[in-house]
Amino acid sequence: MKVILLKDVPSLGKADSVVNVANGYAKNFLFKNKLAEPYTERGQKRLDLKVIKRNEQHDLLALEAKNLAKQLEGVVLEYDIRTNEEDKAFGTIGFKQIVDDLSKKHIFVTKDMLDSKMKLDIGEHRVKINIFEGIHATILVKVSKAQ
């Protein structure tokens, strides 16, 4: 029996795919748990429209990500940090500070977009921001000693 999967089913397929399964498996498990629906022409048309809509949405998100990347290019953030007599910093610059300062410039990113291994001590650092699938931007963060 041909069915359209409504949700991901391990070892069978991903949501919105058409698969062949045994009649009993479809009726007793997939339909009962609302994991699939019977394959019909109407269901196929609905599936095609859903895929087209998802692709359009993906393209729109990619375009917004490219615009955000253009905004981020050339951005320089400067911070002063306290140090001891041996020029060892008391702490580092964190994700929250960078996200907050970018939002003050009307550039909205989330901390999930920043590299999780980043540790910003005194000096100049290039911070890579992962915006969307394959779309990245780099900002310059300058950290200097507080006077």
From Swiss-Prot:
One of its GO terms (biological process) is translation. Keywords: Ribonucleoprotein, Ribosomal protein, RNA-binding, rRNA-binding. SUPFAM superfamilies: L9 N-domain-like, Ribosomal protein L9 C-domain. The keyword ATP-binding does not apply. It comes from the Bacteria. One of its GO terms (cellular component) is ribonucleoprotein complex. GO terms for molecular function: rRNA binding; structural constituent of ribosome. Belongs to the bacterial ribosomal protein bL9 family. Binds to the 23S rRNA. This is Large ribosomal subunit protein bL9.
